[in-house]
């Protein structure tokens, strides 16, 4: 009788433990301790950029292909694990890609370095920045940029608004986005789409007359900063004309509705 009761209690304990499995994210972001502020998103993106060596997205890298895994920052010691943290912390618990790293796919299998496009982590990076900055459950975390671009364009996000690149000047902490490959010709008028498409988004971290500095993940296999030309009005382009950037066709700005510009002036 005692054994049966002990077994029942043990099973009940195990079931309760499974039901209350720990969240992927730290407590301070699961239920944000501080407001979701612009300054934190910029600081987090900048911190990650410095971790990867403060690399700049140079025009000379266009079309460059690594000859070995050692030429890919995402696969280097200390950095492949960091990419794994972008996946793990940036994705929701039901997303299988949350178990990936900079060189591992499902189950911890190392994928060929020539096949890393299937494991593109730029959206995981943006999701990570937004989550750690304190967006809570308001950001549409996803392994695909199209998810939150479409959510913003369709009015399905409480903290994102899709803005035309020729009329809205991106602010610090906003996201600028472009299509890639088959989606390279997407325009603002195409949004929202009924399908997922390959793309790239980056966080605006600095602005000077004529230039925005943006930080994005998985840019030539690293976190890199890109200099983006803007008009005198601060927009990516002028009405009826292509965007000024001749390298990348940025076609939408995601205005992020932060709770505040910076944390409250208290530290007690």
State the predicted function of each range.
Residues 73-74, 95-107, 156-158, 187, ...:
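Surface-exposed intrinsically disordered loops and tails
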Residues 22-135, 265-268:
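N-terminal capping segments
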Residues 138-220:
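...with weaker cross-activation on analogous glycine-rich loops/strands in unrelated enzymes
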Residues 1-8:
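Bacterial N-terminal signal peptides that target proteins for export
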Residues 221-268:
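Low-complexity, Gly/Ser/Thr/Pro-rich intrinsically disordered linker/tail segments
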């Amino acid at each position: 009788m005692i054994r049966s009761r002990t077994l029942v209690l043990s099973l009940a304990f195990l079931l309760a433990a499974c039901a209350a499995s720990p969240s992927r994210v730290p407590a301070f972001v699961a239920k944000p301790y501080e407001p979701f502020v612009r300054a934190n998103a910029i600081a987090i993106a900048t911190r990650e950029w410095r971790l990867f060596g403060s690399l700049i997205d140079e025009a000379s890298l266009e079309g460059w292909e690594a000859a070995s895994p050692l030429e890919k920052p995402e696969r280097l010691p200390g950095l492949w694990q960091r990419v794994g943290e972008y996946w793990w912390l940036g994705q929701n618990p039901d997303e299988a890609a949350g178990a990936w790293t900079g060189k591992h796919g499902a189950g911890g299998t190392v994928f060929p370095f020539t096949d890393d496009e299937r494991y593109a982590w730029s959206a995981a990076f943006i999701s990570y920045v937004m989550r750690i900055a304190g967006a809570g459950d308001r950001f549409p975390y996803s392994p695909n940029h199209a998810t939150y671009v479409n959510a913003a364009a369709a009015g399905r996000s409480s903290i994102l608004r899709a803005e035309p690149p020729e009329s809205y000047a991106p602010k610090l902490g906003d996201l600028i986005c472009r299509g890639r490959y088959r989606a390279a010709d997407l325009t603002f008028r195409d949004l929202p789409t009924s399908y997922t498409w390959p793309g790239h988004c980056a966080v605006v971290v600095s602005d000077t007359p004529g230039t925005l500095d943006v930080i994005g993940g998985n840019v030539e296999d690293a976190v890199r900063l890109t200099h983006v030309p803007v008009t005198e009005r601060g927009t990516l382009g002028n009405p009826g004309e292509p965007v000024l950037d001749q390298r990348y066709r940025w076609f939408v700005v995601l205005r992020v509705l932060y709770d505040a510009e910076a944390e409250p002036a208290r530290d007690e």
